[in-house]
């Protein structure tokens, strides 16, 4: 029987750091994300799905699953996807420039530049050539 683990220190450092960031993003989104907020039902359901994707992606990477890496990549892009869908649904009064700033995560309604930096760093870690080559060769 194969041992299941939550963290695998034997993967390249890009994937090891990505695992930690995925867990941190998932926990912080659950604690401080406002699941019961005043957003539309579609956004709240997509938000819950992205939290599950963060945790499942990190767990899948730790257990050497190709599906885990793929879900982690989708989860890493989810903040930008959620903000884009949110602008399509709720923010018709935004100008085009304000919508772009909101989707990127900066501006008066965005999540903040520091959060955006960590979102981009997670994407870079998962799509780094070392991470991609490792998952192609070793993940099942």
Residues of each region from the PLM?
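Topology signature of small-to-medium multi-pass alpha-helical membrane proteins
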Residues: 1-140
């Amino acid at each position: 029987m194969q041992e299941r683990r939550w963290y695998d220190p034997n993967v390249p450092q890009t994937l090891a750091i990505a695992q930690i960031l995925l867990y941190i993003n998932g926990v912080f989104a659950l604690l401080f994300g406002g699941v019961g907020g005043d957003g539309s039902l579609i956004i709240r359901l997509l938000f819950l799905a992205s939290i599950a994707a963060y945790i499942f992606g990190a767990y899948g990477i730790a257990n050497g699953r190709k599906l885990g890496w793929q879900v982690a990549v989708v989860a890493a892009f989810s903040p930008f996807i959620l903000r884009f869908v949110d602008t399509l649904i709720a923010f018709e009064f935004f100008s085009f420039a304000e919508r772009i700033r909101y989707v990127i995560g900066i501006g008066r309604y965005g999540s903040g530049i520091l959060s955006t930096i960590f979102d981009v760093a997670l994407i870079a870690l998962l799509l780094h050539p070392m991470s991609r080559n490792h998952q192609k060769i070793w993940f099942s």
